[in-house]
Amino acid sequence: MNLSRCLLALLLFGGPLAPAAAAPWVAGLHHMTLTDPVDARPMQALAFYPAQGSAHGIRIDGYPVEVADEAPVALGQFPLLVLSHGNTGSPLALHYLATGLARQGFVVVAVVHPGDNARDPSRLGTLSNLYGRPLQVSAAITAARDDALLGPYLNDGKVGVIGYSAGGETALILSGAQPDLDRLRQYCLERPTDADACKTHGVLIADRSELAPKADARVGAVMLMAPLSLMFGRHALASVRVPALIYSGDNDQLLAVDRNAEALARKLPVTPDYRLLAGAGHFVFMARCDKEQWARMTALCKDAEGVDRRHIHHSLQRDTAAFFSQALGAPEHGERSAATAAPRQQQR
């Protein structure tokens, strides 16, 4: 198992970057409204995709992004990825990764999880959140396949899921993992000061007891950053048979690495590519902050001395694209797309 603690010193301590090949596309942005499977209410998603035209700087929910808003999709066939953000978070906190992957030929649909986002935390600590988040990602996969703008340009292969923090838990459930709620209770007895995992003292609110963890056979690979995974032992992970790329920081003050990413990497039945970043904390995976964000959320912007967030993000963009290209098939340039070709049968 690749459990070597990859210190990635060049990335973390400001070593020189290898020249990056110029991205062949610009990142497009498409706004999507879906139906939340939990309560049948509208839910939002942002789709980043390889686009034609020119990108422009815009600001969405306080995050500056460079995109071509609702521009035509570039001609070709592209793998589909779905991004799941952390508890009370925003997919825009990972905009650098979504736009970077779009420029390299991936369609990235970033769900805003209802009841567990920066504006609305009402489902935090509930069963409807734990089991509803994967259902929302599955709904996003179906919606993307059926979307008039995106659908004709998606390849026929499996789908990748990117999960950050609690989004890692979501990705694992979609891959076949079965959460063990007793593990959460036991963990919170041992470490009651873990304010993030133990907000409800290890007992989730059974607001929707009829819900259950549901895997999605369309998922073919996962990329996890600082994953929340303490509810998964070996037995709970036995059905997870997809390739995984896992990143974590060894200075994560929010999620205990030994009980989350490190334990997960040991227990997955398919050996993951596990990369431990020296000195990095939980928030190193979030987009670099501008002056306004530094003033508003300093704790999320600041890294330990010697940790270079820009270099880490460059590595994430490059290596995530390579990982999904190998696992799902590489993006394909094309003079025409499925929109002008013969009808095909896609995985919906």
Q: Where are the predicted features?
A:
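Catalytic active-site module of serine/aspartate enzymes centered on a nucleophile-bearing elbow/loop
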Residues: 291-348
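Domain-level recognition of soluble alpha/beta enzyme cores
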Residues: 23-83, 93
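Cap/lid segment of the alpha/beta-hydrolase catalytic domain
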Residues: 88, 92-95, 112-135, 143, ...
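Short substrate-entry loop that stabilizes the transition state in hydrolases
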Residues: 54-55, 66-78, 83-120, 253-257
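Alpha/beta-hydrolase active-site loop
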Residues: 126-156, 169, 173-175, 183-199, ...
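Acidic catalytic loop of the alpha/beta-hydrolase fold
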Residues: 230-231, 251-255, 282-283
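Short alpha-helix in the alpha/beta-hydrolase fold that links the catalytic acid
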Residues: 242, 256-267, 289
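Short beta-strand/loop motif that positions the catalytic acidic residue
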Residues: 240, 246-248
